[in-house]
Amino acid sequence: MSIILGIDPGSRVTGYGVIRQNGRHLQYLGSGCIRTSEKDLPGRLKQIYAGVTEIITQFQPDAFAIEQVFMAKNADSALKLGQARGAAIVSAVNHDLPVYEYAARLIKQAVVGTGGADKAQVQHMVQHMLKLPAKPQADAADALGVAICHANTNKTLIALAGQATSAKRGRYR
């Protein structure tokens, strides 16, 4: 059983989602958005760091999963996104959490079944998969999608490790 914190980074709005994975079962623990109010980027990064630190303290996750930077058309936006990711990652590292990064297409594939899914499809499937009474906010749904992607990846790795162990045992008998 593990608790996974998923992060959808942004310099103005950073989504977060927390789930508990118990084998194949996923349980929703919480989600929301860290909304920055500072005008300057360093102030916003400080708010992201503080917000992620507060979430880590509250939920005590075992793993930290974050969306990778995509190549935006605007280089300035991509740099700011990278800095927002950095602020969140530093908080995780300061709490000795393992950090996992996933591409947006892989996250959408894990949640919706296609890497080209839009935000509404991700929201719908996150609501369905976690049995939520209402659709989560878009940024929170994306963050929950990151956590779900990590849980699915983690399950696959555990299954593969089990197969490798079984195969190894078979060879030595």
Swiss-Prot record:
GO terms for cellular component: cytoplasm; Holliday junction resolvase complex. It catalyses: Endonucleolytic cleavage at a junction such as a reciprocal single-stranded crossover between two homologous DNA duplexes (Holliday junction). This is Crossover junction endodeoxyribonuclease RuvC. Its main location: cytoplasm. It comes from Vibrio vulnificus (strain CMCP6). Disulfide bonds: none annotated. The keyword Kinase does not apply. InterPro entries: RNaseH-like_sf, RNaseH_sf, X-over_junc_endoDNase_Mg_BS, X-over_junc_endoDNase_RuvC. Belongs to the RuvC family. The gene is ruvC. The RuvA-RuvB-RuvC complex processes Holliday junction (HJ) DNA during genetic recombination and DNA repair. Endonuclease that resolves HJ intermediates. Cleaves cruciform DNA by making single-stranded nicks across the HJ at symmetrical positions within the homologous arms, yielding a 5'-phosphate and a 3'-hydroxyl group; requires a central core of homology in the junction. The consensus cleavage sequence is 5'-(A/T)TT(C/G)-3'. Cleavage occurs on the 3'-side of the TT dinucleotide at the point of strand exchange. It is found in: Cytoplasm. Mg(2+) 1 binds at D8, D139. Its cofactor is Mg(2+). GO terms for biological process: DNA recombination; DNA repair. Mg(2+) 2 binds at E67. GO terms for molecular function: crossover junction DNA endonuclease activity; DNA binding; magnesium ion binding. It is an enzyme of class 3 (hydrolase). Keywords: Cytoplasm, DNA damage, DNA recombination, DNA repair, DNA-binding, Endonuclease, Hydrolase, Magnesium, Metal-binding, Nuclease. HAMAP family: RuvC (MF_00034). Its EC number is 3.1.21.10. Binds 2 Mg(2+) ion per subunit. It comes from the Bacteria. Pfam families: RuvC (PF02075). The active site is at D8, E67, D139. Homodimer which binds Holliday junction (HJ) DNA. The HJ becomes 2-fold symmetrical on binding to RuvC with unstacked arms; it has a different conformation from HJ DNA in complex with RuvA. In the full resolvosome a probable DNA-RuvA(4)-RuvB(12)-RuvC(2) complex forms which resolves the HJ.
